[in-house]
Amino acid sequence: MKEKSLMQELIGEVFGTFILILLGDGVVANVGLAPRLAAGGYNWNTITIGWAFAVIIAVYVSGGVSGAHLNPAVTLTMALKRGFSWGKVVPFILAQVVGAFLGALAVYLCYRDGLVSAGNPNVWTTGPGSVF
């Protein structure tokens, strides 16, 4: 099997982390804003199942390319315990941060109107700001 280049691995991490945050935070936004909008009747089970599918899809997308670390803590642990190259740790973490930021930005843009109508989305972690 052909070895992947570092750039391919980093792109895999960006896409995987993007998908993880897009789908995971997306379900939190949907459930959190639903009572304030037209829908309703969702609970923590919906969030749990949504995050489970987010992880499954993100691992499926990036697993074959980068190993699907998708989290700086996983990357650091892999370097400490599993022989992952220390030279790749910082690039992987940067790729994960970029992917997470892009995923959160996409959720914000998709749910911007709902966040604004719910009121002051940047202040309370128990309110609309809890989406992020």
Functional labels for PLM-detected ranges:
Residues M1-F132:
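Membrane-interface helix-loop junctions and terminal tails of multi-pass membrane proteins
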